[in-house]
Amino acid sequence: MRELSKETSLQRVMRASGRVPVQCSCSVCKQQCHTPYLGTPDDIERIIDAGYADRLALTNWAAGIFLGVINIAIPMIQPVAGKEYCAFFENGLCILHDKGLKPTEGRLSHHTVRKDNFNPAMSIAWNVAKEWLMPENEDVLSRVVNKFLNARKP
């Protein structure tokens, strides 16, 4: 009997948020690239493997507390914000796009999400953040933390 395929982090976030990957280059969507997008543990592992650990940081995602979807901050490793923009924003573009490394929040984000149609439980950011708490991500979480710490050793 064939084993059922395991749902990926991207598939779980897509299902929970109701979003699908989009490619839009309108001015509103381009503006979103100024702020770091959240990545799942799988996304962050690919970014580390591509040699960008120096543009990542340990962080606690607390937005969920303010959204009312969780009562604790979620520890994770994410892209850092530079002085003005995301650490991956160079010469008016995100360098991760063409390398296939765009974090899940960025892959699913689109200018159609507005304050008047925002549902915190379906938020892309919340559903990406939940991936850092999922027991099924235990192996990738362990690898990500080890790779991140090893890459950051002096």
Predicted regions and their residues:
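Short loop/turn segments that flank or connect secondary-structure elements
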Residues: M1-P154
